């Protein structure tokens, strides 16, 4: 350990996210600690973990992460979360939830995602969407399933509609 303990959070950038142990560790560059030397493997700090249970997500290379050091020792880094460097980095699906409305967005870099929103009506609820446009939407209005290529099933009230009126069951 260096002479002075390193307490607090430090901005860092992911340089390696392929953990040989597959436990969510990453290697980062922490400019305020050692500008050109990558850290040893930074352990993840996750909201929940246990045997065959927990939250697992690893940031992509180049992502901004917050790093702390166990007992202030730079040989024991912990990545405790991530940050966006600009508005352009925020997941596109997050913009479907208006500011001030409770919502949760999970999205991969290729835009496969899940949005849960408290927006009332047809635009709220739960939306799962793939990169190619296939989606499942569950809202107060009903449920819509689309393959992104034209096939659509809509369930509203007691009605099931297939392909915009090609078959309707009441």
What are these regions (language model features)?
Residues 165-169:
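Short, low-complexity, Pro/Ser/Thr/Gly-rich segments in the mature regions of secreted, periplasmic
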């Amino acid at each position: 350990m260096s002479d002075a303990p390193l307490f607090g959070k430090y901005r860092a950038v992911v340089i390696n996210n392929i953990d040989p142990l597959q436990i969510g560790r990453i290697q980062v560059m922490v400019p305020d600690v050692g500008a050109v030397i990558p850290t040893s493997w930074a352990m993840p700090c996750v909201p929940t973990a246990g045997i065959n249970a927990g939250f697992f997500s690893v940031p992509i290379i180049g992502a901004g992460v917050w790093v702390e050091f166990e007992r202030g020792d730079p040989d024991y880094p912990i990545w405790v979360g991530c940050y966006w460097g600009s508005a352009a980095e925020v997941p596109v699906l997050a913009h479907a939830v208006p500011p001030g409305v409770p919502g949760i967005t999970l999205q991969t870099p290729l835009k496969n995602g899940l949005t849960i929103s408290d927006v009332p009506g047809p635009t709220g609820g739960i939306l799962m969407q793939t990169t190619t446009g296939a989606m499942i939407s569950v809202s107060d209005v009903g449920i819509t399933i689309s393959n992104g290529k034209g096939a659509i099933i809509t369930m509203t009230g007691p009605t099931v509609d297939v392909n915009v009126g090609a078959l309707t069951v009441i």
